[in-house]
Structures are given as structure tokens and as C-alpha cells.
């Protein structure tokens, strides 16, 4: 029974350390900034590409605005 317990326990410890390392690496205090890159006719791949050019860690998304247009928003960590 010990042989089954030890590898499972070691795997659990390694997994826990990895998860805590990833979660600990995230910045809780970091605010998110948004920039409108295109006012209408957003294409997802184009929006994502423009956002990555603006900020290498940015995430471009096409969303529907309050005026009914599909706009490109770029989300990134504020400087």
C-alpha cells in the first residue's frame, strides 16, 4: 500500500507547488486598461493582431458597442 501512496503524494505535492507558483505570479493589484482600436466592422484576427502590436501582452476582442457597432477593444495591463 505504501508504494501506491508515495507516488501519488509526490505528484500531488508537485502539482500544488506548480499551481501556487502560477497563482502567485499573477498580479492582483494590476489594473486592466482598455483601448478602442477600431470603431466598426471588427474582424477577430485583425483585432488581435493590432492589439498585439500595441502591447505584446494585450488581448484583442471584438464586442458589440452600445450603438450596435462591432468594435475592437484591446485589453492590457496598465503601465
UniProtKB/Swiss-Prot annotation:
User: How far does the signal peptide extend, from start to end residue?
Assistant: 1-24
User: What are the disulfide bonds?
Assistant: 33-78, 42-62, 47-72, 51-74
User: What Gene Ontology biological process does one annotation of this record name?
Assistant: killing of cells of another organism
Q: Where in the cell is it found?
A: Secreted
Q: Which UniProt keywords apply?
A: Antimicrobial, Disulfide bond, Fungicide, Plant defense, Secreted, Signal
- Domain of life, per UniProt, equals Eukaryota
On whether S-adenosyl-L-methionine is a keyword of this UniProt record, the answer is: no
Would you tell me the Gene Ontology cellular component terms?
extracellular region
Chief localization: secreted
Which InterPro entries does this entry report, sorted A to Z?
DEFL
Pfam families per UniProt: SLR1-BP
Recorded hits in PANTHER family, A to Z, give:
DEFENSIN-LIKE PROTEIN 153-RELATED (PTHR33830:SF38), DEFENSIN-LIKE PROTEIN 184-RELATED (PTHR33830)
Q: Which family does it belong to?
A: Belongs to the DEFL family.
Q: What protein name applies here?
A: Putative defensin-like protein 137
In its UniProt entry, the species of origin is given as Arabidopsis thaliana
Amino acid at each position: 500500500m505504501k508504494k501506491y501512496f508515495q507516488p501519488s503524494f509526490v505528484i500531488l505535492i508537485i502539482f500544488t507547488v506548480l499551481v501556487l507558483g502560477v497563482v502567485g505570479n499573477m498580479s492582483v493589484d494590476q489594473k486592466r486598461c482598455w483601448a478602442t482600436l477600431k470603431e466598426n466592422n471588427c474582424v477577430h484576427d485583425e483585432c488581435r493582431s493590432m492589439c498585439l502590436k500595441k502591447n505584446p501582452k494585450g488581448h484583442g476582442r471584438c464586442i458589440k458597442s452600445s450603438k450596435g457597432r462591432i468594435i475592437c477593444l484591446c485589453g492590457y495591463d496598465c503601465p
